[in-house]
Amino acid sequence: MSLELKEKESELPFDEQIINDKWRSKYTPIDAYFKFHRQTVENLESFWESVAKELEWFKPWDKVLDASNPPFYKWFVGGRLNLSYLAVDRHVKTWRKNKLAIEWEGEPVDENGYPTDRRKLTYYDLYREVNRVAYMLKQNFGVKKGDKITLYLPMVPELPITMLAAWRIGAITSVVFSGFSADALAERINDSQSRIVITADGFWRRGRVVRLKEVVDAALEKATGVESVIVLPRLGLKDVPMTEGRDYWWNKLMQGIPPNAYIEPEPVESEHPSFILYTSGTTGKPKGIVHDTGGWAVHVYATMKWVFDIRDDDIFWCTADIGWVTGHSYVVLGPLLMGATEVIYEGAPDYPQPDRWWSIIERYGVTIFYTSPTAIRMFMRYGEEWPRKHDLSTLRIIHSVGEPINPEAWRWAYRVLGNEKVAFGSTWWMTETGGIVISHAPGLYLVPMKPGTNGPPLPGFEVDVVDENGNPAPPGVKGYLVIKKPWPGMLHGIWGDPERYIKTYWSRFPGMFYAGDYAIKDKDGYIWVLGRADEVIKVAGHRLGTYELESALISHPAVAESAVVGVPDAIKGEVPIAFVVLKQGVAPSDELRKELREHVRRTIGPIAEPAQIFFVTKLPKTRSGKIMRRLLKAVATGAPLGDVTTLEDETSVEEAKRAYEEIKAEMART
């Protein structure tokens, strides 16, 4: 079946090319880049071997790639290394010993809006703390290579410190996002078979205390096998329930650890698991994605160089929570692997004012900013005056991650945040890939920018867009995103479920990794990811991606944000409905509602016109910034909301319900 774009289904700027003067010397012709790219995928093993040689290995590999048992590929077989050594030890042997590694900022502020909770850690500080925590885990709890540790912590320095300490020993981490419920936490503890859980008493979120230890206690009523719980007193709460013989205060344990404690880094095999990270599926058991050590390190190292062009004087800020894969790769490992200085922030992006993030960029002189399209669209709604209050001139690179970025959001951020002087890209990758796969690469060769595109595949990644039969889709034709050859950071499987690994990723198109995304490759070879193939509305047999509809709505000057879901229809099978957040100063009206429906009709086609448009002041999002479309669909269909523990603001669902009920009542009266 053809997935060709319908007439005006998408007005993506395929032919628009932007070259700014500040980066002009870095630009290369598109054809020249793809000639180089073709050489890297045709000589895959020698290319990735040359990258791997730039890292320090305790023992070199015997074989670059073992492809004898596809799709269970192994990279740098026989090689031994340690992530903690690469991220910390090797830097303290150089001038970077006293360089700042982490600038951490908590959420609380004083009456003038200045943060009251800040910490600075040099690479030597980090080295000492990682060793002390590793010593504590090994001596007090007998943690050894292969043990699983679940971390249920907020965005505090102890989270990356503990991950590095665990990897130092050879333990396997399972970080669970601190917004997950007790049931979700229990499920992940059971599946990973963790015997230790590390958590905190609580943390700050939008000025409120979020209690964590009680969630762990509730989870352990259902989870089995946990022997010990270590509790970090982040807030110093006095009424935290502690179970004798199982629960231990972090600070009391650390009091007994010598300041010069040292644990020898375990030289683990390249294919040794470093972490398990669970993907949040809409149905069924969460998938425990397993990543190795050597391949992941090489992939993250390469992308830090190519995509972020890291220099010694850079201040790097990735806004992702460490509970997600972006935080693993580009908060914990990536910046520290490069010896960079990074910013970590605990709280909400717009608390107590919508300029919190911009004040952070100004305060620390952030040069590289990695964030989500959802966050950018939220700030668009607040208006330009908030970023204009701050000096953002230090920014030289901005990248987005997590979902496709609409061309309008791209242009806004490029102009308002980057002053049209930054290199700006939209990276594509996923939990399963381990690191960035498609992106502009200002640290390597910068091809002309196009608003909203993900750009070309990075060197060493053979990416394509294929049709229903697995054949390459022609330029401009919508298809499925696949990766045709193995890559170093690829997942090593699903924890304890090899059959599901094969079925989920390798059975749809045999011999190719199926990403589950719709995409278009334009005539220049740029990839435009359109969103999940399962985020599709089928109207009278026509497939419509939610991304295309949302992009059409956001392109209207009155709209700040939108979310589109499909609801059952007796005639068409399914029809799209839209929840729309208007820009400040724009009043909702029936006339505007009609105008927006007509705008979508003109932009995409009659088939895409929303059956209803609901005006809301906020959309339900996770704390990582992703729109929770399933909640909007539940509101519209009357279905149970399900688990809402990751919801940032519960009033957003009530807002959607109110808007929906108002329209229903109005329709009943007419």
From Swiss-Prot:
Pfam family, one: ACAS_N
Keywords recorded for this protein, A-Z: Acetylation, ATP-binding, Ligase, Magnesium, Metal-binding, Nucleotide-binding
The keyword Nucleotide-binding belongs to this UniProt entry's keyword annotation: yes
GO biological-process terms attached to the record: acetyl-CoA biosynthetic process; acetyl-CoA biosynthetic process from acetate
Modification N6-acetyllysine occurs at: 626
Parts of the chain that traverse the membrane: none
Positions contributing to ATP binding: 402-404, 426-431, 517, 532, 543
Binding residue positions for CoA: 205-208, 326, 601
SUPFAM superfamilies per record: Acetyl-CoA synthetase-like (SSF56801)
MF GO annotations: acetate-CoA ligase activity; AMP binding; ATP binding; metal ion binding
Top EC category: ligase
Binding site for Mg(2+): 556, 559
UniProt-listed PANTHER family: ACETYL-COENZYME A SYNTHETASE (PTHR24095:SF232)
Family, as annotated: Belongs to the ATP-dependent AMP-binding enzyme family.
Function per UniProt: Catalyzes the conversion of acetate into acetyl-CoA (AcCoA), an essential intermediate at the junction of anabolic and catabolic pathways. AcsA undergoes a two-step reaction. In the first half reaction, AcsA combines acetate with ATP to form acetyl-adenylate (AcAMP) intermediate. In the second half reaction, it can then transfer the acetyl group from AcAMP to the sulfhydryl group of CoA, forming the product AcCoA.
Protein's recorded name: Acetyl-coenzyme A synthetase
Organism: Pyrobaculum aerophilum (strain ATCC 51768 / DSM 7523 / JCM 9630 / CIP 104966 / NBRC 100827 / IM2)
